[in-house]
Amino acid sequence: MTITISAVILAGGKARRMGGQDKGLQILGKQSLIEHVINRLQPQIHQISINTNRNQTEYAKFGFPVFSDELPDFQGPLSGMLTALEKTKSDFILFTPCDTPFFPMNLLDKLKSAVKNDRTLIAYACDEEREHPVFCLMSVQLKEKLRHYLASGERRLLQFMKENGGISVKFTQEEGNFENFNTLDDLKKTVI
């Protein structure tokens, strides 16, 4: 089974715990968080887009297509995912958040293997501690179900995935980690 895949970095949230600062544009070391994410994604996949609901001009400077949620009012990652699924020409989209710069370099390979081997429409990451559903490979075939799910008022990402046959794919600490940065203090405490 040959499938086409593109990637979308989700940077469309309000970042309330970061004092409203745009997470993806915050600096860790000498680069913004989104630059760290791009640097980890590029060896894995070439077709990358950025989903953001503000600072589009700043994000466009990274050289990738930028788009906003079609649904208003910052409705969470599923809103960005739905917009991406409606716009893509790919069979699947690899989603990553903009605030998690150390995710595994084999993220796409393992999620793609799970999709192919288990013939599922969604595979998402987990580690020894918990599930990380924003790191997922999702089929465009789910866009209608996702549209109806959001229209019903639901916003729970993991619930949507489980209701639609999503499977978790385990990653070890050695492969990378899913530590994200939610506050400016988190960034200040981290040395790279």
Curated annotation (Swiss-Prot):
<feature type="binding site">
    <location>
        <position position="99"/>
    </location>
    <ligand>
        <name>Mg(2+)</name>
    </ligand>
</feature>
<dbReference type="GO" id="GO:0005737">
    <property type="term" value="C:cytoplasm"/>
</dbReference>
<feature type="binding site">
    <location>
        <begin position="10"/>
        <end position="12"/>
    </location>
    <ligand>
        <name>GTP</name>
    </ligand>
</feature>
<keyword id="KW-0501">Molybdenum cofactor biosynthesis</keyword>
<dbReference type="InterPro" id="IPR013482">
    <property type="entry name" value="Molybde_CF_guanTrfase"/>
</dbReference>
<comment type="similarity">
    <text>Belongs to the MobA family.</text>
</comment>
<keyword id="KW-0808">Transferase</keyword>
<keyword id="KW-0547">Nucleotide-binding</keyword>
<dbReference type="InterPro" id="IPR029044">
    <property type="entry name" value="Nucleotide-diphossugar_trans"/>
</dbReference>
<dbReference type="GO" id="GO:0046872">
    <property type="term" value="F:metal ion binding"/>
</dbReference>
<dbReference type="GO" id="GO:0005525">
    <property type="term" value="F:GTP binding"/>
</dbReference>
<dbReference type="GO" id="GO:1902758">
    <property type="term" value="P:bis(molybdopterin guanine dinucleotide)molybdenum biosynthetic process"/>
</dbReference>
<keyword id="KW-0342">GTP-binding</keyword>
<dbReference type="GO" id="GO:0061603">
    <property type="term" value="F:molybdenum cofactor guanylyltransferase activity"/>
</dbReference>
<keyword id="KW-0479">Metal-binding</keyword>
<feature type="binding site">
    <location>
        <position position="69"/>
    </location>
    <ligand>
        <name>GTP</name>
    </ligand>
</feature>
<protein>
    <recommendedName>
        <fullName>Molybdenum cofactor guanylyltransferase</fullName>
        <ecNumber>2.7.7.77</ecNumber>
    </recommendedName>
</protein>
<dbReference type="InterPro" id="IPR025877">
    <property type="entry name" value="MobA-like_NTP_Trfase"/>
</dbReference>
<feature type="binding site">
    <location>
        <position position="23"/>
    </location>
    <ligand>
        <name>GTP</name>
    </ligand>
</feature>
<feature type="binding site">
    <location>
        <position position="51"/>
    </location>
    <ligand>
        <name>GTP</name>
    </ligand>
</feature>
<comment type="subunit">
    <text>Monomer.</text>
</comment>
<keyword id="KW-0963">Cytoplasm</keyword>
<dbReference type="Pfam" id="PF12804">
    <property type="entry name" value="NTP_transf_3"/>
</dbReference>
<comment type="function">
    <text>Transfers a GMP moiety from GTP to Mo-molybdopterin (Mo-MPT) cofactor (Moco or molybdenum cofactor) to form Mo-molybdopterin guanine dinucleotide (Mo-MGD) cofactor.</text>
</comment>
<keyword id="KW-0460">Magnesium</keyword>
<feature type="binding site">
    <location>
        <position position="99"/>
    </location>
    <ligand>
        <name>GTP</name>
    </ligand>
</feature>
